[in-house]
């Protein structure tokens, strides 16, 4: 199996992306196709010993930066690493694609060159979030669709359900709607209409609304929302986590006794940090497009890239997209 990697995508590319690819081929049977500036990639690779039959390079001289407008950049930079990686997938020269680059550009490229799974109204960007249980939850959408209809959210629920069933082996995953209150009837018109749609569809194990404070408790396996709400929720959670660790670090260093206590608790802090570490998951799929595309965090280092590549392999093997297509037949008012 071949997985294309946008080697120039992310804050630490191309060094960390390349290192992640080298780690991935040690722990899996995939071949990684590095898409990026060949000269730079060759300079990095010469310092490592690896199975040269399982690392390939496709030259891409352009890079879509994080600040660039996604749709414009995709059209203007056809020789960019993101676009070329997606094109390889379209041409079936690879089985999946991974990028830690400009999320909007990955989304735009995938829609332009791969299209949607037949019947999917809107694809969704998902992310895995750590919980108090042993299994993460998936939340979608987190930014692809800021304006949604109830039918879009119903399809997000379906795609999240199938993903958690297949990837995490959760039978009949619990599905919830992210809302401003737990009670039925809460929220705006979209939330209320979506609630009724999910509640009355027998294929869903719908448990009702969850509030933002409950996101990380593991109450639901799949959390559904529009991209506007989802993006704010995730970015807020990231900010709170970073600030909390900074405050703890500052307090631990404030006196001798707190420093000693901090040293004693260091293993516990490491366990907590590992549970919150996005690199453990690697990335999350762009669900609903006609191909396996994994989006990694922009700050991904080698470990996250390695895990994203391994996740892409797993998603391909599990035929998630085929199962989504089959699942659509169980939703009324499909439309194309």
Swiss-Prot record:
Compartments, as annotated in UniProt: Cytoplasm
InterPro entries from the UniProt entry: FA_synthesis, Phospholipid_synth_PlsX-like
Catalytic activity entry: a fatty acyl-[ACP] + phosphate = an acyl phosphate + holo-[ACP]
Enzyme superclass (EC): transferase
GO MF term (any one): phosphate:acyl-[acyl carrier protein] acyltransferase activity
Alphabetical GO biological process terms: fatty acid biosynthetic process; phospholipid biosynthetic process
Source domain of life: Bacteria
Keywords: Cytoplasm, Lipid biosynthesis, Lipid metabolism, Phospholipid biosynthesis, Phospholipid metabolism, Transferase
A cellular component annotation (GO) from this entry: cytoplasm
Pfam families linked to this entry: FA_synthesis
The protein's annotated pathway: Lipid metabolism; phospholipid metabolism
Enzyme Commission identifier(s): 2.3.1.274
Function of the molecule: Catalyzes the reversible formation of acyl-phosphate (acyl-PO(4)) from acyl-[acyl-carrier-protein] (acyl-ACP). This enzyme utilizes acyl-ACP as fatty acyl donor, but not acyl-CoA.
Assembly and binders: Homodimer. Probably interacts with PlsY.
Entry's family note: Belongs to the PlsX family.
NCBIfam families, A to Z: plsX (TIGR00182)
Name of this chain's protein: Phosphate acyltransferase
């Amino acid at each position: 199996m071949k997985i294309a990697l946008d080697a120039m995508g992310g804050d630490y590319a191309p060094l960390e992306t390349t290192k992640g690819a080298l780690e991935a081929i040690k722990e899996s049977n995939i071949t990684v196709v590095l898409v990026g500036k060949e000269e730079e990639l060759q300079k990095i690779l010469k310092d490592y010993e690896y199975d040269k039959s399982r690392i390939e390079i496709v030259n891409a001289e352009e890079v879509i930066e994080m600040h660039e407008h996604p749709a414009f950049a995709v059209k203007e930079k056809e020789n960019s690493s993101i676009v070329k990686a997606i094109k390889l997938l379209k041409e079936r020269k690879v089985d999946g694609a991974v990028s830690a680059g400009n999320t909007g550009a990955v989304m735009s490229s995938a829609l332009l060159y791969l299209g949607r799974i037949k019947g999917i109204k809107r694809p969704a960007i998902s992310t895995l979030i750590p919980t108090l249980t042993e299994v993460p939850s998936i939340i979608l959408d987190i930014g692809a669709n800021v304006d949604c209809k109830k039918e879009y959210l119903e399809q997000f629920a379906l795609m999240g359900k199938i993903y958690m069933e297949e990837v995490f082996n959760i039978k009949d995953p619990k599905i919830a709607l992210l809302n401003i209150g737990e009670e039925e009837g809460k929220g705006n018109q979209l939330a209320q209409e979506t609630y009724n749609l999910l509640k009355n569809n027998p294929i869903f194990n719908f448990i009702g609304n969850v509030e933002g404070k409950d996101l990380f408790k593991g109450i639901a396996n799949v959390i559904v929302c529009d991209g506007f709400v989802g993006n704010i929720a995730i970015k807020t959670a990231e900010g709170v986590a970073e600030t909390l660790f900074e405050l703890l670090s500052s307090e631990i260093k404030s006196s001798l006794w707190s420093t000693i206590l901090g040293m004693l608790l260091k293993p516990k802090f490491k366990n907590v940090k590992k549970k919150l570490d996005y690199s453990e998951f690697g990335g999350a799929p762009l669900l609903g497009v006609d191909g396996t595309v994994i989006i990694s965090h922009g700050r991904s280092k080698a470990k996250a890239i390695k895990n994203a590549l391994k996740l892409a392999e797993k998603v391909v093997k599990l035929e998630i997209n085929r199962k989504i297509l089959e699942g659509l037949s169980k939703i009324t008012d499909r439309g194309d």
